[in-house]
């Protein structure tokens, strides 16, 4: 069976909410006219059931059903823990 959920990885920029975190996704887009690569950033609110991610962690997230008005992504795993404690 083909997995129908998209998966992305990004950095946690806020975890001050209960069971939620905000993840920043960075990507490069080629400008259509000038052909220069431009950095784009997307902030996504994710569901973190066990409050296990902390500020600065690199996490892997996947798309899921809408959990609230802003949350439709959930934490899959923490790829790299931040050095901050």
Swiss-Prot record:
Gene Ontology molecular-function annotations: rRNA binding; structural constituent of ribosome
GO biological process, one term: translation
Alphabetized Pfam families for the sequence: Ribosomal_S17
Keywords, in A-Z order: Ribonucleoprotein, Ribosomal protein, RNA-binding, rRNA-binding
Residue spans crossing the bilayer: none
Keyword Ribonucleoprotein: yes
Domain of life: Bacteria
Gene3D superfamilies named in the record: Nucleic acid-binding proteins
Keyword Ribonucleoprotein: yes
UniProt xrefs under SUPFAM superfamilies: Nucleic acid-binding proteins
GO cellular component, one term: cytosolic small ribosomal subunit
Role, per record: One of the primary rRNA binding proteins, it binds specifically to the 5'-end of 16S ribosomal RNA.
Subunit structure: Part of the 30S ribosomal subunit.
Family assignment from sequence similarity: Belongs to the universal ribosomal protein uS17 family.
NCBIfam families with a match to the protein in the record: PRK05610.1, uS17_bact
This protein's name: Small ribosomal subunit protein uS17
Taxon lineage: Bacteria, Pseudomonadati, Pseudomonadota, Gammaproteobacteria, Enterobacterales
């Amino acid at each position: 069976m083909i997995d129908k959920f998209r998966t992305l990885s990004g950095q946690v920029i806020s975890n001050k909410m209960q069971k939620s975190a905000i993840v920043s996704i960075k990507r490069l887009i080629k400008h259509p006219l000038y052909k220069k690569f431009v950095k784009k950033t997307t902030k996504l609110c994710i569901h973190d059931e066990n409050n296990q991610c902390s500020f600065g962690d690199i996490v892997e997230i996947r798309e899921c059903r809408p959990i609230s008005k802003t949350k439709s992504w959930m934490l899959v795993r923490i790829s790299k823990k931040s050095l901050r404690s």
